[in-house]
Amino acid sequence: MIRVLVVDDHDLVRTGITRMLADIDGLQVVGQADSGEESLKKARELKPDVVLMDVKMPGIGGLEATRKLLRSHPDIKVVAVTVCEEDPFPTRLLQAGAAGYMTKGAGLAEMVQAIRLVFAGQRYISPQIAQQLALKSFQPQVNNSPFDLLSEREIQIALMIVGCQKVQTISDKLCLSPKTVNTYRYRIFEKLSISSDVELALLAVRHGMVDASA
């Protein structure tokens, strides 16, 4: 029996995935988590074999949660399940140790296939994302996303800024001082050659970091 933990900040998504997997032979959803922080706690308590991890969540987010989870539980397999198809998200998650990366538009059969493959020690990447990653390797470096210049923490804070979260809110969620958050903000602006939150938001939309229709 493959033990699965579902991590997503949207209750409807977690419930939907859990219900879809309920009737699949050989799979058991042992729990749900609504944040990266809770996923670490649930992983310790429930000892899942596979974690279905959302990428964009409040708090530490799926990227950092994956890195921390695998540092403490290297035998767990993480499959990112997200709307983020554009790089640098797939590359970042795979570099962090995720064994799989698939979109939320995937069907039940694909999700079950991904879970079983990573449990068996293989990798799974949705075909459209695998194609993008393959094509990227043939592109000149100049065409790569400027967000590749940012660290994992900088990307996390950049997305929180784009999401209109105030410095104090970011400080509270990440357990950082406001001064440290402002330092990160300065570094982000410097690396991306921008000077305002509006420019950051536009750049994030242009490079697929956020959904323009959201």
Curated annotation (Swiss-Prot):
Modification type 4-aspartylphosphate: residues: D54
Keywords annotated in UniProt: Activator, DNA-binding, Phosphoprotein, Transcription, Transcription regulation, Two-component regulatory system
Highest taxon of the lineage: Bacteria
Response regulatory domain sequence ranges: 3-119
Coiled-coil positions: none
UniProt xrefs under Pfam families: GerE (PF00196), Response_reg (PF00072)
GO molecular function: DNA binding
Residue spans binding DNA: 167-186
Domain HTH luxR-type stretches: 143-208
Swiss-Prot/TrEMBL GO biological process terms: phosphorelay signal transduction system; regulation of DNA-templated transcription
Keyword Transmembrane helix: no
Signal sequence region: none
Function, as annotated: Required for production of extracellular enzymes and fluorescent siderophores.
Name of this chain's protein: Response regulator GacA
